[in-house]
């Protein structure tokens, strides 16, 4: 509202993680706005931040207004609501190349934080249906995990949106008309909404993340 723009609802998919890797998501108990401001001023906000140990394949949903941070040792794919706004409330006193502390947005952030919705959560994955696991379905995007071990027709007609296919394990060849594209681990391709189908050929057991907008 401050800038006349959207909030930033997000989803995190952990691609890889070191043994001691963790994220920060929400608070570890209810924190009032007044307590938040006091802790920020005295430098002990970290005491009430909720830390989650992470491992490869974990999925987290971050609603707009929730305090969050990706910490060291994490390689994460982020899907988010379209927004150009990020409020930084704490930066571990890190400095840029010129020795300056990065800008913080403490006053703006305290207006944006939803202090009533303070508990983050890891998503409990449901059993696969025909090789597809729905990870997140919200008003801003849908993300599915596709497990592919043999060639298959990929029907795009029911999806009234562009589609992002992200290879998170293995690699595949995408074929359509007389053309093809190879997608390897760590790569993403955008499929235009006008395309109705293509053929997916995995070379090894493969996991793809399918992301689109629910229209």
Feature roles, as predicted:
Residues 186, 199, 208-214:
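Sequence termini and other peripheral, non-core segments
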Residues 53-72, 81, 183-197:
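Conserved metal-binding segment of the jelly-roll/cupin
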